[in-house]
Amino acid sequence: PMWVRRTLTWMSLHAPDLRVPHGLAPARISHDRAVVKAYRSDPLVRRRMTGRLARFVDEGGRESLREADLLPCRTLLMVAGDDSIVAAEGSRQFAQRAPAQLLTLRWYDTAWHEIFNETAPISDPVYADLDEWLARTAQALSLPPVLTPSAQEAGTP
């Protein structure tokens, strides 16, 4: 929301190191309740942010969009389509501006923020897409096959 952006801009200029609650809703990071519970009890999770950090994130996102056409390497962009933590639409905008021959976009309509820590019906296609992209990219670059944890568990190359 615009009021949040204005508040964080003011903070970054007048109180850049003041830590305030970020207001992110942990209940919406994953459909898997165990993941949410682990997140809530993790002492390393920071529940506050500074105006300086907010400005850095905002400016970094804008710069990424401005310079998307300069993407120098093959990239797999995997997006949670129902993400309430970050604006998924920004990823779509980035993909539209990046060189099409270098960027592969995979969009998961019902996924929340933690696409690799979702329930199986949601995360299975995520891991399958990653496995496929890594194999295709390794083959194109004449590299030996790469096994992700999900491919190793399945016993597939």
Language model feature labels by segment:
Residues 1-50:
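Alpha/beta-hydrolase-fold enzymes
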Residues 49-67:
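Active-site nucleophile elbow and catalytic-triad environment of alpha/beta-hydrolase enzymes
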Residues 51, 87-91, 119-120, 127:
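Conserved strand-to-helix beginnings and helix N-cap segments that scaffold or border functional pockets
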Residues 73, 87-97:
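Short alpha-helix in the alpha/beta-hydrolase fold that links the catalytic acid
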Residues 104-157:
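Catalytic active-site module of serine/aspartate enzymes centered on a nucleophile-bearing elbow/loop
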